């Protein structure tokens, strides 16, 4: 609720000097609701905030400080706000505000007070007025048939606010800050996950490349089996064909040599032709020597008797 006070310098000085006006206006409390709780509007203010002067105006005495309070005009204490002994009245559904609009107030206090009214009995009023340190528990506001207008919807022209213990703007700002922090944390987590995945992929690629690197060419198992079978065949071959044995050994030696693709590709076609022609010549000469040896053995021996 917006709380408003209008005090003139003349009124404030009179209350500070003599309490005559205070006694006359204490009778106005009878026009308050039947429970008779709250502070009167004529209580003087101990604060020096209202001691400044903005010019004297004689018509200010006809404002709400002089009119008789209507049943809907309630007066509330605001001791919890730290504004002690300050005469304030809550603007509600009464015509006092319309009477004051034509006059400029000396000061206007707009105060955010706690979320509950602090009502006191008339007996405790004087004691608590002196000592503000006593804890005051909020009491429920009893209904009154005379103040039916107080519970109705107030006039739009009257300044009224909702009582809040915390500012909604600060809550919105805090929620926005929390959302920003959470969003940044999520982004950082996502970036870390992406980095971890990239590192794992790099490691897997490195392992694959290591496996694909060529190893030095060794004799294949087929070549080894052939080399083992080679000496086993040697006794089967006849002693009469040494050329055949030499050709078999030469073939086996050629097979036992490491055969790599790079060596085969490096050989030129001319070298291949020369090697093939050389091998053919060797085979031909060996065959001719074998034929001549057979002819010598098969030649008939001359019979001496026939001669």
UniProtKB/Swiss-Prot annotation:
Compositionally biased tracts (Basic and acidic residues): 250-260
InterPro entries per record: PLipase_A2_dom_sf
UniProt keyword Secreted, yes or no: no
Biased composition (Polar residues): 216-228
GO cellular component term of the entry, any: mitochondrion
Region described as Disordered: spans on this chain: 134-155, 183-307
Keywords, alphabetical: Phosphoprotein
Protein name: Protein PROCA1
Native organism: Mus musculus (Mouse)
């Amino acid at each position: 609720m917006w709380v408003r006070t209008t005090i003139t310098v003349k009124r404030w000085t009179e209350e500070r000097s003599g309490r005559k006006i205070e006694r006359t206006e204490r009778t106005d409390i009878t026009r308050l609701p039947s429970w008779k709780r709250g502070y009167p509007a004529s209580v003087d203010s101990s604060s020096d905030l209202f001691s400044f002067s903005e010019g004297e105006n004689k018509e200010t005495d006809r404002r709400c400080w002089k009119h008789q309070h209507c049943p809907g005009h309630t007066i509330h204490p605001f001791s919890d706000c730290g504004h002690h002994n300050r005469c304030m009245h809550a603007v509600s559904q009464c015509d006092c505000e319309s009477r004051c609009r034509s006059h400029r107030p000396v000061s206007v206090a707009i105060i955010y007070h706690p979320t509950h009214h602090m009502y006191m009995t008339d007996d405790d009023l004087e004691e608590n007025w002196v000592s503000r340190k006593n804890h005051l528990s909020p009491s429920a506001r009893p209904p009154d048939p005379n103040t039916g207008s107080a519970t109705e919807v107030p006039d739009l022209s009257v300044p009224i606010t909702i009582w809040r213990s915390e500012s909604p703007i600060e809550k919105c700002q805090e929620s926005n800050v929390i959302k920003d922090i959470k969003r940044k944390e999520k982004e950082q987590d996502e970036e870390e996950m992406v980095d971890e995945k990239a590192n794992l992929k790099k490691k897997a690629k490195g392992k694959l490349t290591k496996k694909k690197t060529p190893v030095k060419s060794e004799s294949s198992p087929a070549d080894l089996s052939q080399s083992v079978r080679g000496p086993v065949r040697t006794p089967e071959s006849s002693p009469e064909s040494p050329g055949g044995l030499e050709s078999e050994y030469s073939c086996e030696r050629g097979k036992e040599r490491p055969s790599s693709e790079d060596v085969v590709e490096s050989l030129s076609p001319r070298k291949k032709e020369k090697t093939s022609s050389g091998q053919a010549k060797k085979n031909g000469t060996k065959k001719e020597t074998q034929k001549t040896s057979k002819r010598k053995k098969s030649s008939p021996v001359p019979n001496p008797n026939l001669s």
